[in-house]
Amino acid sequence: MILSEIANKLLEGTSKPAPRPAALVLEDGAVFRGTACGASGEVYGEICFNTSLEGYLEVITDPSYAGQIITMTYPQIGNYGVNPEDAQADAPALRGLVVRDMCATPSNWRSAQSLPDYLREHDVVAVEGVDTRALVRHVRDCGAQRAVLSTVDVDEASLLAKVRASEPLVGQNLAATVSCEKAYAVGAGDLPASHAFAVAPPATARHRVVAYDCGAKRSILQNLVRSGCELTVVPWDTPAADVLAMAPDGVFLSNGPGDPEAVEGTYSQVEKLLGQVPVFGICLGHQMIAKAAGAGIEKLKFGHRGGNHPVMNLLTGRVEITAQNHGFGLVFPSLGELVPELSGGFKGHEDDLRFWARAGIAPVVDNPRFGRIRLTHVNLNDGTAEGVAFLDIPAFSVQYHPEASPGPTDAHYLFTAFGRLMDSAVLTNGGAADAAATSGTPPCPSAAAGRTEVQSSLASGQSGAPAAPSLTLPDPWECASYLDIDIAADRLAGWTFGEQAATVAGASTKEQGFCGGADCLEGSAADELSGLRAACEQPQVLKGKMPATGSRQAGGED
């Protein structure tokens, strides 16, 4: 009798409710059927897929998925439940979720509730039992497209008519729907207690940073704080004049959803900020910087979404495994014509940017608005642009997610690079000493020496922007000096853990290796940096790579 009762309880705990039919219909007529495992309803969005093996809660709560129906390629989702510490926002922004098998009985000590319960609580329509392998292959071959997911109407003809009448993703300003409504501050006191084992922030913030919220993930803001930034997060369309009035040491542009062409309220302000203050962009922020520079943006066939995308850093030759989530990408040739003397002698652009990875060259273009821009990162799967760095103003950006969540942390060094960039850029009004007093960072000797003044044309007040102090940069100013960071060393030597933070936080910037000038370094590090700067003045050919020769070198014929 006792065994029978135990068996019944186990059965009750592992059984799923009676299945309700659900249907997913794509605009090209493809139909995939399954059973409901979330809230009831009918939703429309762009179908996409994510290849992450774990981190489903981070994916579901990522604001960048606004307007989309996500298909998870891993066969079982929900087996470790849901906990609020891992969520990237207060609530999911996605339209719907498609999985092969939904686990209703999670097993993990951190689990607060099951994923099906979480989805129902937040009115997220979800379906299981779908042949996700067939669905992903279809999206891969036919491209991302409009879709409808319904648990209330499963008639194929009816759903097909509805989805073809729905609004496409292109042209929608979804960033405005997930941005904050008013500015707020984020500091060390806002870090979650459950992450006490993680990287500890310095005792005193080194930099004041204004972050544009176009759908920012919590983990990005937390990583900025842990790297020594005191944040003021502002809405997506905050005027540049208001940002400059805060006198920040740097500006961060966050990730976000949807079509970057529709987020003019952000990139029009970024155009006024470039050249006035150091700028770092991630994902949509990368696209905002590109748009500000006049670049073209293309819609990818099915996007990059997952935690296993290989990207080569063209400055170092290292390959990083990255987390990505985007459906649009920068058209690098649209930034300007190549500068042959800084591009291995090549005069013509390549459609497949893996050409530069094979040649070991980080090409430079001459941008009409902001001068020279170097391609720094390339996707090794499809040859698309993954990162750029400006050579004449302090700004850089990447298309992927260095904070991961979920995914690998190979690119975490970029948060350190942002700190080094802010350390190296000094405001002319008041000089290096006043700038150091503002930021709490000792001035770099090389920054106080020879300088190249960089003044944006917008600083004079064009387009309604107020006059702003120009930036002076160490001469020569090279992106390699702050982007060439050893990944392993950054994970260990550059960071403090737990109680160590209080002791190490008081160390000087020089001791922690955040200064961008060669005079702030010692021994082999200074020699290495000098070598990097010398290399930047010559065609970029990395050791161990094929020489810069080919069918199109120096204007050669195909």
Language-model regions, residue ranges each:
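RNA-binding accessory domains that recognize and position tRNA/RNA substrates
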Residues: I2-C229, V233-A241, M246, P260, ...
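Short solvent-exposed loop/turn micro-motifs enriched in small/polar/acidic residues
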Residues: S15-A18, H304, F370-G371, L380-N381
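Residue-level detector of beta-strand face positions
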Residues: A23-L24, D62, P310-M312, G387
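Proline-centered loop/turn at the N-terminus of a beta-strand
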Residues: V125, R208, P278-F280, G296, ...
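Active-site-proximal beta-strand elements of phosphoester/diester hydrolases
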Residues: R208-Y212, T322-A323, F396-Y400
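Cysteine-nucleophile active-site neighborhood
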Residues: A245, G250, S254-L335, G407-A417, ...
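Catalytic beta-strand/loop cores that center a nucleophilic Ser/Cys/Thr
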Residues: G317-D392, D475, Y482-D486
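Short linear motifs in low-complexity or flexible loops
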Residues: A501-T509, A518, A525-A526, S530, ...
